[in-house]
Amino acid sequence: MHKLLKLPFLALFTALIMLLPAGCGGNAASSNKAPSVSAESSTAANPSPTTAENQSEPTEQVELLVSAAASLTESLDELKTVFEAKHSNVKLIFNYAASGTLQQQIEQGAPADLFLSAGTKQMDALVDKDLINHNLRTNLLTNELVLVVPTDGSVKVLDMEDLTNLGDIAIGTPESVPAGKYAQQTLTSHQLWEPLQPHLVLTKDVKQVLSYVETGNVDAGFVYATDAAQSDKVKVALIAEPESHDPIEYPMGVLKSTVHPVEAKALYEFLLSEQAKQVFSQYGFTPAE
C-alpha cells in the first residue's frame, strides 16, 4: 500500500520542479521591463533643455519719447527709420516744437526720454534743475542763421540795412524760439532791433517763419540754413555773420527720469555715430566738434 502512494507523490514533486524555471523566468521578464517604464516617466518629469530652457522670452516693446527742436524734423524722421531697423523692439515717438516750449513741458513733468534743443540756454536750464543726466549730455550739431525771401518774389536784400525797406519780417519769438533769439541778437548788432519793431511778426517756431515766407504772408524771415535748404519756395538773401549772434549749437541730453535708460542711451550713442552724422550733413547741419 505504501508503494502505491509513492508514485503519485513522485509525479507531483517532479511537476513542481519543472514549474519553477517558468516562474523565475516570468519574474525576470517583469524585472527587465521595469526600467523601461521608469525611463519614460523620468523623461516626462524632466523635459529636455530644448523644450524648456531654450524657449526665449518675448522681447519687451519700448516706446522712447524724444522732445526735439522743430528744425530737426526732417533729419530725425529719416534717422528714426534707420534706428528702428537696428532695434526692432524700440519705437521712437517725436514731439517737435520750439526748444523753449519743450523745456517748459519737461519742467512741468511732461514725459520725455531725450531732449534735443536748438539752443544751449534751454538745455542748460534743465541741467541746472538736475533733470538731465550729466554723463549723457553733449553738443550734437551746429547751424547757420539766414534771411530768406520768396523764390518768385521781387524782394531784394543786399545787406541788413535793406530790411528797413521791407514790409513784414517774420522771426521766432525770442523768448522761446532759439532762431528768434539769434535773429534778435543779429538785428541788435546792426542797430536794427528797435527800428524794425513795427515790422516784426513773431511766430511759435522756425517752421512757421518758413511757412509765412513761402506763402507770401511776409516779405522775409530769419530761419536756419537747414530749413531754407528744404524748401524750393524760398531763397537765401543773406547769411547772418557768426559773430553777430551766439553760437548756434544743438545740445542733446538724456532725461534722468527716463524709464528706459538702456534704450535711451542706445539712441543717444546712435545719434553721435558716423552714420547719423552723414544724414545730418545731408540736411545742412554740421556735426559739433
Regions found by a protein language model. Give the residues of each.
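Exported/periplasmic ABC-transporter solute-binding proteins
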Residues: 24-81, 100, 104-107, 119-120, ...
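Short, high-confidence coil segments that cap the C-terminus of an alpha-helix
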Residues: 89, 111-112, 218
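C-terminal motif of bacterial Sec signal peptides marking the signal peptidase cleavage site
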Residues: 19-23
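Signal peptide-proximal N-terminal region
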Residues: 81-94
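Bacterial N-terminal signal peptides that target proteins for export
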Residues: 1-12
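Conserved beta-strand core positions
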Residues: 64, 90-92, 145
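Central helical "cap/lid" subdomain
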Residues: 126, 130, 134-138
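Periplasmic-binding protein-like
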Residues: 113-117
